[in-house]
């Protein structure tokens, strides 16, 4: 969720809805797949707002003692960061929203400068018990300059 929020801010987008999904291996006995969605009161790219919205969704679909093969988040109904339609029941004033945006930009800047995860959200845990396997990661020649093939004549 944290990386999805960072990506939204980097692309100058806000999400008005989000979906959380999980599934076990389809090849293992007791296959399980589930998803849950929610609409946000206001479109947002604020990590704290998105984590708060995701928490009840995860609680609803998570099944303990089931090894997950895949889990993810979908940000939906994306809107430009420059356009924000507000309404009367806004939980934050415009000044508070600007302060939150400044905080998110500062956190992103620190994490870019000192490495991803330098500043973390407490709810995400300090030491994850697992890490994504990346030993067979495909090259991303279309999206990363470092992965472009070098041709020598």
Please provide the spans of the model-predicted regions.
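Basic, low-complexity intrinsically disordered segments
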Residues: 1-153
